């Protein structure tokens, strides 16, 4: 996620910053399908002595959504939903980038005493 350096905002007028902020907010679009985290795939061995996984063919891969807070709360993602989850994660990364830039603009507006 790349947020413009504050020096880039110093060159812009307050009106330009406000217009940029409005444009960024409008570009967020539909945020109902946003996920934050990552998608990981794992393979498993069941431990049964006569299973194919003991011969080097593990079960899976199984997809899991891992929230930002770490391994805790991993959610299984059925194979049919993996493309949907990938799209939602991409939308989440896009939204985070936009929100970071909006926040940086708001910091500059606050420094100018023009936030509002």
Sequence positions of predicted segments:
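A positively charged, amphipathic N-terminal helix/segment that binds anionic biomolecules
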Residues: 1-116
């Amino acid at each position: 996620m790349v947020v413009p350096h504050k020096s880039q905002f110093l060159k812009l007028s307050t009106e330009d910053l406000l217009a940029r902020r409005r444009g960024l907010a409008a570009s967020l679009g539909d945020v109902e399908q946003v996920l934050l985290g990552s998608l990981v795939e794992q393979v498993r061995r069941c431990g049964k002595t006569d299973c194919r996984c003991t011969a080097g063919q593990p079960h899976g891969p199984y997809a899991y959504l891992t929230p930002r807070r770490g391994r805790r709360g991993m959610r299984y993602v059925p194979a049919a939903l993996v493309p949907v989850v990938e799209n939602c994660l991409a939308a989440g990364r896009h939204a985070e980038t936009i929100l970071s830039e909006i926040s940086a603009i708001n910091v500059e507006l606050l420094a100018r005493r023009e936030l509002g």
